[in-house]
Amino acid sequence: THFYHGNIIRFCNRPFEDVEMMNETIISNWNNTVGLDDTVFHLGDFCLGGSAEWTKILDRLNGKIYLILGNHDLKNLRQGYVDRFEHVTMQMHIEVDKQKIYLNHYPFLCFDGGYKDVWQLFGHVHTRKNNTGIDAARLQYLYPTQYDVGVENNNFMPVSFAQMKIIIEKQVEQLKMKEQ
């Protein structure tokens, strides 16, 4: 999400005039997608600034948020926001509807689990639809069971498990077609 990160607008060519517009759009999209009791896994680079900025954002977001730390989050560990999350960690393995999922801020070519049976969801890179954007060239070796859940790649909205399943199944099918 990169809340309060002014440079990300220019760096990633985000379609916002300023930080306030970006924050408000993402908060609105989030709350229109996520219910009060929904579980959210945020894959890092949540917010820049200190505990005041983090608190302003967290006070407005729906859901029970698990934070997988990103490179921009590490320096804020001491700021007092950690207790606002359900859990804060560097990585996480979860299972949803019998689907094993590995969560990390970074994409990995080697990760814990079988590449056909385990999904890997990540952030960090700033791609857009159809594998475009500033980091797209570096991602050409990803497995079809991996996906960038970052906001630039998902219309500045959270992605549900049902949406993920459709996306990853489509990526797997596209690879099968290419291999034939």
Predicted regions and their residues:
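Core catalytic region of metal-dependent phosphoesterases/phosphodiesterases
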Residues: 3-96
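Conserved beta-sheet core of the metallophosphoesterase superfamily
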Residues: 82-177
